[in-house]
Swiss-Prot record:
One of its GO terms (biological process) is 'de novo' pyrimidine nucleobase biosynthetic process. It holds the Pfam family OMPdecase. GO terms for cellular component: cytosol. InterPro entries: Aldolase_TIM, OMPdecase, OMPdecase_AS, OMPdecase_bac, OMPdeCOase_dom, RibuloseP-bd_barrel. It catalyses: orotidine 5'-phosphate + H(+) = UMP + CO2. This is Orotidine 5'-phosphate decarboxylase. GO terms for molecular function: orotidine-5'-phosphate decarboxylase activity. The lineage of its organism: Bacteria, Pseudomonadati, Pseudomonadota, Gammaproteobacteria, Pseudomonadales.
Length: 232
């Protein structure tokens, strides 16, 4: 498998294997990695990861595990056994849960995926947090959870690009994965806190998750190439 040097992760947010592979077959694994989320994984199970890896892609398994420490750690181990490049868990599961995942990966005898923490979903604003009992700005909650992730030894965080500068300043070791990326002129859809790819990298993001601007483009390969060119 050729190592991808691009920061772009294309979201394969599809309900079927056929639809996901139809897009993947138009993409160059040297120009992007791919993300398998809940819908596709639930539909296709682990086989979709194997197929994508056989096509040369590094896979971000975006299942956002959140359970008691042992259960979550065993799920992360199962992801590592699949050969995924990156896996994520919810930071709100707490320090012990994240630390258990870290310890399990350290003991894993094989390539270790990047272990990424999910802070605050990019669709959530202050009123959404208030609705679940958190009277706090999203950025404050992100910083609170980031400190737990750092303490637990996580490799990085999922965060919006607006949070990236503060996170890089406070936790320069952590790699930042940013969804809600829309090239200039794209619709915002359901991601509220968004920036363009260039703005996100300049803000401190390390990896950019891009879905509909590529997957729904008339020519996905051309759309991907245009973003790569924009990033220089």
């Amino acid at each position: 498998m050729s190592a991808c040097q691009s920061p772009i992760i294309v979201a394969l947010d599809f309900p079927t294997r056929e639809a996901a592979l139809a897009l993947a077959d138009q993409l160059d694994p040297k120009l992007c990695r791919v993300k398998v989320g809940k819908e596709l994984f639930t539909s296709c199970a682990a086989g979709i990861v194997e197929i994508l890896r056989d096509k040369g892609f590094e896979v971000f398994l975006d299942l956002k595990f959140h359970d008691i420490p042992n259960t979550t750690a065993m799920a992360v181990k199962a992801a590592a056994e699949m050969g995924v490049w990156m896996v994520n868990v919810h930071c709100s599961g707490g320090l012990r849960m994240m630390a258990a995942c870290r310890e399990t990966l350290e003991a894993f005898n094989g390539p270790k995926p990047l272990l990424i923490g999910v802070t605050v979903l990019t669709s959530m604003e202050r009123e959404d947090l208030a609705g679940i009992g958190l009277d706090i700005e999203p950025q404050e909650q992100v910083l609170r959870l980031a400190a737990l992730a750092e303490k637990a030894g996580m490799d990085g965080l999922v965060c919006s690009a607006q949070e990236a500068p503060a996170l890089k300043g406070a936790h320069p070791r952590l790699q930042l994965v940013t969804p809600g990326i829309r090239p200039a002129g794209s619709a915002q859809d359901d991601q509220r806190r968004i920036l363009t790819p260039r703005q996100a990298l300049d803000a401190g993001s390390d990896y950019l998750v891009i879905g509909r601007p590529i997957s729904q483009a008339a020519d996905p390969a051309k759309a991907l190439a245009a973003i790569v060119a924009e990033l220089g």
